[in-house]
Design a protein with these regions (language model features):
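N-terminal loops that bind phosphate or other acidic moieties
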Residues: 1-115
């Protein structure tokens, strides 16, 4: 039997059973672009996530060739890079950028519960 890589991995970790109790699924991608919609891991995870559970993506950068979200089962995408930087600067600040993005997403979730 031939399976896609993401389906193999999700089966190995019993994803379908584990995701049932999730309130939110967060996927990651280095750079999200139109090619990401053609079978890369984030879309594979979104495809296997029940439709009642939102999926968001955290990515290094978002390319402008993507359609507006939601798309391919992903409700929203958040790039961690807020400005144009040289690669060495991006890599040097990755931890801080990821932390800041996660904090902003957490704040957005808290805010949504008060609306």
């Amino acid at each position: 039997e031939i399976k896609s890589g993401i389906d193999f991995v999700l089966d190995c970790v019993d994803f379908d059973q584990r995701v049932k109790s999730a309130d939110l699924v967060i996927v990651g991608e280095g750079r999200m672009d139109s090619q990401s919609l053609s079978g890369k891991a984030p879309v594979g995870v979104a495809r296997r996530t029940p439709s009642a559970i939102p999926v968001i993506a955290i990515c290094g950068s978002l390319k402008d060739d993507l359609p507006d979200f939601p798309v391919a089962g992903i409700s929203a995408a958040f790039p961690i890079i807020g400005q144009v930087l040289e690669l060495d600067q991006v890599l040097a600040t990755a931890k801080e950028n990821l932390y800041r993005t996660g904090l902003n997403i957490g704040n957005l979730i808290k805010l949504s519960k008060t609306l």
